[in-house]
A protein has these predicted regions:
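Acidic low-complexity segments
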Residues: 88, 108-187, 191-205
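Short beta-strand segments and strand-loop junctions that repeat across beta-rich extracellular domains
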Residues: 262-269
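Intrinsically disordered, low-complexity N-terminal segments that are enriched in acidic
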Residues: 10, 27-121
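Catalytic Cys-His active-site segments of thiol-dependent hydrolases/isopeptidases
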Residues: 272-279
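N-terminal export signals
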Residues: 5-27
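Conserved small/polar residues in nucleotide/adenosyl-binding loops
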Residues: 283-285
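Active-site neighborhood of thiol-dependent amide/isopeptide-bond enzymes
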Residues: 164-173, 178-260
Length: 285
């Protein structure tokens, strides 16, 4: 996976690509000097030992534009194969899927994604008048998943954390965040971002993991307490503004820069980013 920052107008996209509608002039300035930065990321998967028909899929960046992220479009290619863009409606995710027939030497799928991003900050000292979230979205982000249940030991742990906590959801989420930071740790032996199997972590009392585990723990404990929360998977594309080498992309090749973080929702504040894994990880820089 390769990343390069680009500052020129993107060239015309092939008809098969998802074309963006955001002119570069829209990113010329940002409130408070929080400038937009534009990136191009190329992701390529090549199967070295194919057997029969090859199927490859790759995710694309966020489909819905945010105040910290805008999509500028995606292009893709899979020589000798058929490619289609698929939208997963439940979580509003986009995937490029390729099917390449047997006999193609080293079948491969390449996706080039262009997007703009800027620093994200939420002032939690007071409500900011954020618009109310769609109730269906909040309901979705209170639901259990296979690896993030909200009953049993997860709910018991959440209740124990909050038993003496008084205050609104912001105060309660902060207490959960601090518990995760105080009780979990980064385990370098865990592959990738981890599985995020929080029930097993709590049952075994093995609180070591990677970003996918530690942020999933925060999300599950929040959901069990009735606080909408979700984990977001992506990849780091820029250097850390604070000088943390392991918390930024320090080369053009970002194949190992995958990261998971979390966010939770509080009425009047909107979605608030949280990353206990990076809080813990700073001790390992």
């Amino acid at each position: 996976m390769n990343r390069r920052k680009f500052l020129q107008t993107a060239s015309a996209m092939p008809a098969a690509a998802a074309a963006a509608q955001w002119p570069l002039s829209a990113f010329a300035a940002a409130e408070g000097g929080n400038a937009w930065r534009m990136f191009e990321v190329t992701t390529r998967v090549e199967l070295l030992k194919p057997s029969g028909v090859s199927k490859i899929w790759l995710p694309v960046p966020l489909l819905a534009d945010k105040d910290f992220h805008k999509s500028l479009g995606n292009t893709w290619s899979a020589p000798g194969g058929d490619v289609r863009f698929v939208t997963e409606d439940k979580y509003n995710m986009g995937v490029v899927a390729a099917e390449i027939p047997a006999g193609v030497d080293k079948p491969a799928l390449t996706v080039v994604s262009r997007f703009a991003t800027r620093d994200r900050e939420v002032d939690i000292s007071k409500p900011n008048g954020a618009p109310a979230e769609n109730p269906a979205v909040l309901k979705l982000n209170l639901q259990p998943t296979e690896l993030i249940p909200t009953d049993g030991i997860v709910r018991e742990t959440s209740r124990d954390i909050l038993k003496n906590v008084k205050g609104n959801d912001l105060v309660r989420a902060r207490a959960i965040y601090e518990w995760v930071v105080d009780n979990t740790f980064r385990d370098a032996k865990v592959r990738g971002c981890g599985w995020g199997d929080i029930k097993s972590m709590l049952e075994t009392r093995n609180f070591g993991g990677k970003c996918g585990d530690l942020n999933a723990m925060f999300v599950g404990l929040c959901r069990s307490a009735g606080i909408p929360a979700r984990d977001l998977y992506g990849i780091r594309v820029a250097k850390s503004n604070h000088g943390y080498v392991s918390m930024g992309a320090n080369t053009e090749v970002i194949s190992r820069a995958q990261h998971c973080r979390a966010e939770f929702y509080v009425a009047g504040y909107g979605w608030i980013p949280a990353d206990p894994a990076d809080e813990i990880g700073r001790a390992h820089v």
